[in-house]
């Protein structure tokens, strides 16, 4: 006997490889040129900027003393994918929660932009070291809509597993093995428990360990103090880099701003607030300021000290997305009839997002070997990232925020 | 009049005799300068986080004007000049602190291209400093003067005493003989990075300027008299004391007219 209410588990550990193209059968999509696609991608970047900041502020609201780390691109694409299988309020809430203005951007353009973005991030020749994967875990008696399944496989590169959720330990193991394998062992036990009546689960993961264009010398790394707060100090390995870097002081944010380029068209923006100005920074930061930071390069002589760290994020997306207006998909009124053929309503009973990032000294060998330039001899400002700071990692072409993080205690994983 | 002439002569003689180096034991590879050996040397400092930080050296050329490097003042910070300074972290009793009122960088200076040259700026002070044994004007060379190769020169400053090391607390000096333009611009040295509007000195792999020395003077002896022939500008990104990568200075004698015009019109 099929349960009267089907429960869906959504596990978001990261980035969707591909957003399905528009599913409507009666609309024939014509190919657009690369040139036309680029503005659409920027549309998405603009929207994801607002989305990323809204999400960040919600996380700060939940706890302002914890590390924060998440992937706006990953969360947005997963929900955009779900929107293709949802209808009514469930559908509308998702797109508006992701902060798309549906009077300015057509839904077809939204999905096209996501597709283009994901193609950019997952180019085979990219030097970016992003690891992403997608798994659909379906109860062995549930039948998925063929169209949705096809799109998930073709555009989402999803792997589909048939599992017996009645055997919850076995089902849990299948999901956890998938994520652990895809993240090279970095994310274990992605799912700790499954609700008794779960029949549908989606797992995504994202792992990033980029190479700096301008690497740190490991010989310069030494132990130093990091001031978590006024009364707490921890010891961390502090990397050091001196040279012509993109650094400036932003009086609007009351922060020093550092840009570091990764190989593969990604950049990290580090924001180091002056003492007592973290809350000001968090309240003042907006996508216009970030765009200016990315576009206006200001190389100058500087010496930076930044912790070597591994940071991960693990969030309950129901708690996180509800304040953004995405509520229907999580309750009994959810309409996910585009995903399952069953008459019984499907519900997202649990959604978890996980992401992992390593920041260390590693750079591209060639870049290190060929560095030669004249260096002015003013005493460089010394920026010590020895108290809580923010960072945002962008895909350069689209300015899409791949990751947003706040380091409060670098010794916490 | 005669009394003045005698005084000036005494100052010059004293300057010459006191500057004969005893040993150069450790700027990079330099040694602590004797107090008031280089009375035209200043410390340029910027305000940040409620305190002042040394960033560059400079040369007092008028009682209310300082010559330094343009890259020293690229950032819009609040700057001050300290004259009569010896120990940055102690009260020597001889210091005078004065705010920078106006900054005039060379119009052709491009902060993204230090090897193009023009790395020179003049700072007008908010008030004139008092000249004494510890505070003097730097002597500048005649316009167009070109140093002979291997001329005896000293770089002075509070710059790092080791690549990526700490600032010196007391004023340092290092003997850096000049390197002619033809040698310095050869491919085994700096190549085309060095221009004729620059002066090179050092390059033995031991002694050099380093971060914190920028803007400060290169004192060279010509015809028995020291003059400030260089404004400290850049070193190699591979490190401060790299063999065949002499410390590079803006050549002061190329900018005499420009400086005179700036001072006259400001």
Swiss-Prot record, chain A:
Residues 368-387 are annotated as: RCL. GO terms for biological process: acute-phase response; in utero embryonic development; protein N-linked glycosylation; response to cytokine; response to peptide hormone. Pfam families: Serpin. It is found in: Secreted. The record marks 377-378 as: Reactive bond. CDD domains: serpinA1_A1AT. PROSITE patterns: SERPIN. Its main location: secreted. The keyword Glycoprotein applies. Residues 1-24 form the signal peptide. Glycans are attached at residues 64, 101, 265. One of its GO terms (cellular component) is extracellular region. Disulfide bonds: none annotated. GO terms for molecular function: serine-type endopeptidase inhibitor activity. InterPro entries: Serpin_CS (IPR023795), Serpin_dom (IPR023796), Serpin_fam (IPR000215), Serpin_sf (IPR036186), Serpin_sf_1 (IPR042178), Serpin_sf_2 (IPR042185). Keywords: Acute phase, Glycoprotein, Protease inhibitor, Secreted, Serine protease inhibitor, Signal. Murine alpha-1-antitrypsin is represented by a cluster of up to 6 individual Serpina1-related genes. The precise complement of Serpina1-related genes present varies according to the strain of the animal. Belongs to the serpin family. Inhibitor of serine proteases. Its primary target is elastase, but it also has a moderate affinity for plasmin and thrombin. The reactive center loop (RCL) extends out from the body of the protein and directs binding to the target protease. The protease cleaves the serpin at the reactive site within the RCL, establishing a covalent linkage between the carboxyl group of the serpin reactive site and the serine hydroxyl of the protease. The resulting inactive serpin-protease complex is highly stable. Variability within the reactive center loop (RCL) sequences of Serpina1-related genes may determine target protease specificity. This is Alpha-1-antitrypsin 1-2.
From Swiss-Prot, chain B:
The keyword Secreted applies. Disulfide bonds join 56-72, 153-220, 184-200, 210-240. Its cofactor is Ca(2+). One of its GO terms (biological process) is elastin catabolic process. Its EC number is 3.4.21.36. Keywords: Calcium, Disulfide bond, Glycoprotein, Hydrolase, Metal-binding, Protease, Secreted, Serine protease, Signal, Zymogen. Binds 1 Ca(2+) ion per subunit. Pfam families: Trypsin (PF00089). Belongs to the peptidase S1 family. Elastase subfamily. Serine proteases that hydrolyze many proteins in addition to elastin. PANTHER family: CHYMOTRYPSIN-LIKE ELASTASE FAMILY MEMBER, CHYMOTRYPSIN-LIKE ELASTASE FAMILY MEMBER 1. This is Chymotrypsin-like elastase family member 1. It comes from Mus musculus. The gene is Cela1.
